[in-house]
Every structure is written in C-alpha cells, then in structure tokens.
Amino acid sequence: MELGLSLGEAMADAGRELVLGLGMGRREEAAEAGRRDHEVRRELEFGSMSSRCGGSSPEPTVRLTLLPMVPGLGLPWPPPPPPSSESRHLEASTRGFDVNRPPSSGGGGGGGGAEEEQDDVAGAALSSSPNNSAGSFPMDDFSGHGLGGNDAAPGGGGGDRSCSRASDEDDGGSARKKLRLSKEQSAFLEESFKEHSTLNPKQKLALAKQLNLRPRQVEVWFQNRRARTKLKQTEVDCEYLKRCCETLTEENRRLQKELAELRALKTVHPFYMHLPATTLSMCPSCERVASNSAPATASSAATSSTAAPPAAPSSGGIAATSSSAAAAAAPDHRPSSFAALFSSPRGFPLSVAPQAQPPTSS
C-alpha cells in the first residue's frame, strides 16, 4: 500500500514537472500569483487598520511570502502578467465578501490614498518575488514603448504636417497641385528660355508678375526645362557616339581583312613582285651610247647615198648593195629602252637565191 502511494506521488510530481517544463501551467501560476497578491494586500490592510485603531505601541506588521516549491523551468517562458484591479475585484466577487476587509466608502479620502499606497506596495512585492524575476518590466516597457510610440507618432506626424503646411503656406497654397499653364504662358516661357536659360531674382519676379504666376512656379518650370534639355542633348550625344563607334568598328573590320589578305599573299609568293612596265628603263650610260650613235648612223647613210654610181646596176648588184647597207645599218640601230626593244618587230634578211644564167650561144 505504501509502495503504491509512493509511486502515485512520483507520477504526480513527474506529470507536474512535465507540464511546467512545457509551459502548460501558466494558468495555475497566474492563479497562485493572484492568491499571493490577495493575501499580501489583506495583510497590509490588516496592518494599516491595526496601526490606525491600536494604541501607542502598534505591533509591527510581518510580510509573509508563501512561495510554492516550483522546480526551475526548462524553457525561458515569459512570466504571466500581473493581475489588474478589475481581475482582482472580479476574483473577490467570485470568492465572496471578505469580512476582514474594511469598506472602501467609509475610508474617505485617506482610505483612497491608503489603498493606492497598498496597491503600489503589492505591485512592488510581486515584482520582487523570485517567480516573477522578470517582473512586469518587459510588459511595462512594451506598453510604455507602445504608448510612447503612439503618443510620439501623432506628435511627430503633427510636426511633419506642420512643416509641410508651413512649406505649403510659403508656396502660397495649402495643398500642392500640378501646375497647369495655358498656351500663351507656355509659349512665353519657351521664348524666355531661349533667350536666357537661367534667371536672376529680378527677371524671375518680373516674369512671374507678367504671367500672373508665383516666382517659385517660374523657377520650378525653368529647372524642369533645363533638365529636359540636358536629357535630350545627352540622348543626341549618345546616338552620335554610337554611330561613330559603329563606323570605327566597320573600318577596323575592313583593315583586319586587308591585313589578313596581305599576310596570305606574303606567305604564298614571297619573291614575286608585281611591277608595271613603265618602271623598267635604261641606265644612263646606255642612253649616252644610243644618243651618240644616232648622228653617226645618219651621216654614214648620207655618204653612201652620194657615193653610189649613176649607172643602173644589175639586179644582183642592187640586191648585194641593199643587203650590205642593211647589214651596215642594222648594228647601228639601237632602241631607246627595253620596252621598245621587246615591242619592236625584228626583221630577218632573206637570203637571195642565185639566179641561173642563160646558156651562151656559140
């Protein structure tokens, strides 16, 4: 029997440890914290009543903190939030009327101050307990940040709105609207921009007054117009540079092709040179010899023609004379260049066959 009881207690303790380790006993911990808070408040109220109703030597109040033996949790779960005043009043109403607690209405103003002081002391006691080591500081900080953030957000938003409102008022309007210009205003602004791309304050004021606009609107229009002009010029420059790059690429490709062809010709015909015929000429010494031999040939031809007999020679004598003259003149004829040498036809003398003489009559 004792063995069964001991086993049952061990099982109960093990189950409790398992529940606490998994963080499933938060509701029981909240209930225990509420009970401890109620007991501490009751003790404080009893002590305050005894101090008010007692004699000259009141008994000192002893604060009792009854802490259950709770093993350390395996997981760092956040502590339960401290019970609020509404939950405490609801718990007291469910438990019933407490005869030891004095009515709050009879205390008056002093009772209300004492109750607030007791609530502060109870909150301090709860925050100083070991189970609530973290206390209500994370929640307070979170709520404080939340409230502060909510309070600061409207303030910050109000500051931003006030700044934007001030800037809008400086611009002359409560809300910013896109500037709509008429055709006449646009044309006049374009002409002014062609004359002056930038305006000084006097020109800006005069132009705004003439067009019935604000100076800020004129300044913004000129800024946008300069930006558009710069963008268009950048696009034009980009297109021009792109065309130049394409032209240079084509030229480079053509030069690379020609270079490859020249290298191929150099490797195939290393000793072959294409030279025109006009580059071939005679050396200076040959030219002098040719120029000196030409007058001598002409004088010898004239001498031979004058020395010939007037009698009509026979056919054999004429052929011999012509052949001898041709033989004498042939060595003296020299071309002026190698091109003439190869281009002129060469005449070869034909041998004259001997004619048979007729038989003589006796």
Swiss-Prot record:
Residues 27-179, 301-330 are annotated as: Disordered. GO terms for cellular component: nucleus. Pfam families: HALZ, Homeodomain. Signal peptide: none annotated. Residues 174-233 bind DNA. Residues 27-45 have a biased composition (Basic and acidic residues). Residues 64-75 have a biased composition (Low complexity). It is found in: Nucleus. It comes from the Eukaryota. Residues 145-160 have a biased composition (Gly residues). Expressed in stems, leaf sheaths and blades and panicles. This is Homeobox-leucine zipper protein HOX11. It comes from Oryza sativa subsp. japonica. The gene is HOX11.
